[in-house]
Amino acid sequence: MLDISYQANTFHISHQGRPVGSIQTYSNPYHQTNAYLRLDLADYDCTIAEQLFQSLQTFLGEKPLQVLLSSAEQEKIYFLTAAGFVCKRKCYEFEVTKQDYLSQTGTTNLNIVRKGTALYQRACQQVFNHYQTVHQDINPWTASQEEFEKGLPDLVYTDSENWAFVENIEIAYVCGKDEQSFDSFIQAVIGSLFEQYEQISFEADDCDPIAMRLADHFRFPNKPSWDTYLLES
């Protein structure tokens, strides 16, 4: 017997009269399609997983359910997959030095453009379109383009076909014409940054082929990731 009560954005769960723990719900103002969950259970019993999340999904208006986990959280991962969740996205975080770099320095001519220019605005449009495309099937952007642009750095590297928003040591957003032309472009960006800094950082989602091309220029065997699990409605 599964007993679920809901209070202050938190589901309290008991099984056969014994408290199992809680699952907190929260929302993301920029991605409002899914209902977000944070798991805090004492016991991840896979035999109750399917019934539990079906009940939660019904309560939350049949929205897709989304959970973010570290790839190291194996017990929670087994629990979610037992309920029908699917890993839809892996996000890899990088802090790298020249010693991690596997490629040559690119020879592409780079322009550095700043906020307030026409080319910067074109870059904003390109990266917004790209972001929408690669995340559409997971958790679509539901806020305005203006809101998205507020989070972009003020400086862009470009060769007029490929774009990298950069803030100090961080490559924050990338997009490109295609993977091949992006390769030589991003090699030039990496070379430029390593001339300025000992270390650079970036994130790469495996749903984004352009960002993964950036990641492929560095060593990352068996790298841990932040994984997005989704239970479709």
Locate the predicted segments by residue.
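Conserved N-terminal entry element of GNAT/NAT acetyltransferase domains
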Residues: M1-Y6, T97-T117
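Hydrophobic, Leu/Ile/Phe/Ala-enriched alpha-helical segments that form helix-helix packing faces
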Residues: M1, L41, L56-L60, A83, ...
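Conserved donor-binding loop and adjoining core beta-sheet/short helix segment
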Residues: M1-S55, D154-I186
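Structural motif
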Residues: H15, L80, K115, E147-F148, ...
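Short glycine-aromatic motifs
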Residues: L2-I4, A8, G84-C87, G151-P153, ...
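Acyl-donor-binding surface of acyltransferase catalytic domains
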Residues: Y44-T108, F185-L193, E198-S233
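Flexible, substrate/cofactor-facing loop regions flanked by secondary structure
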Residues: T107-Y173
